[in-house]
Amino acid sequence: VSEQLRIVHAHGDRITVTEPVTGVELLSYVYRAEADWEAPKPYIHPLRTLAGDVVTDYRPNDHRWHKGLSLTASHLSGANLWGGNSYVHGEGYLAIPERVGSMRHVAFDEVSADDSGRVVIAERLTWHPYDGELWAEETRRVEIHDVDLDSRSWALTWTSAITNRRTEPLLFGSPTTAGRDMAGYTGLFWRGPRAFRDGRIIGPDGEGPELMGTQGEWLALSGEHDGADGFATVVFAHAPENAGGHPAHWFVRNEPFAAIAPSWAFFEELALPPGETLTRRYRVVVADGAWGRADIAKYLEGRPW
């Protein structure tokens, strides 16, 4: 039986969730706005295993706008809600500050913990281009659950519903839809710690960096820590209803850094008509140890949606 997880809300800044038996702070959900150039948006960092090992990176020197686990939109109707340089076909990555937008925190509708060991963070956000116009409204639900000291794992379910508030379609794209080969990053994005470079990438039917741009129900990366002994595994899984929408493809790297994104617009733009809502739900499993394909499949099968 799970104990109630502990929540601390530093208003205007962040929400932290702590596992009471180990005393490990599992995550910090930061919603305080940061630098404009980095496309301010909420993010989760640090994200920790039950052993207390951090499995996210924050503002690495190669991409200052990579912040833990966050929802992004690298190409959105000509705007950049990713941060930093913007990809322009034929010219590469350019510093175009007037393209960089933001996802702004509006309010929390729920921040709660129950006796089953589940935490719910329900938030409303607004999406804006550089000039501050309202382009979209988002309802977001981050749930922490299945905290299991025996299997040394826990799970996070992230649901985002984005409603177009423009009078024209919102076009979700990526550097690949803009012309850069096999760089289709957008949507929910995880930047792993530096130690996870060269980590093992595992999918249901294959492994390694060649899983870039492929489709599948789940994808994982395991790496060996610096500092602490041992390994950790981070698993991303699609909710069943995601399959009915615009096709998703995995963005994944273990060189020059570790990253995963279940991209919603890898090869082709996704057009969201005015007033309509794009909903996606994902699960992120954070586990101590180097899980293999069979371990991951067994875990996911044992915890249906």
Q: PLM ranges: what are they?
A:
Residues W37-G90, I202-Q215, L219-L221:
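Extracellular/lumen-exposed scaffold segments
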Residues I121-E123, E138-R140, L156-W158, L188, ...:
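Hydrophobic residues positioned within well-ordered beta-strands of beta-sheet architectures
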Residues V1-S70, L149, G173, A297:
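Beta-strand-rich N-terminal accessory domains
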Residues P169-A243:
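Active-site/ligand-binding surface loops and adjacent short beta/alpha elements
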Residues Q4, S70-R152:
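Extended, loop-rich substrate-binding clefts of extracytoplasmic carbohydrate-active enzymes
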Residues V234-W305:
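Beta-strand-rich recognition/accessory modules
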Residues Y29-R48, L149-R200:
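Acidic (Asp/Glu-rich), glycine- and aromatic
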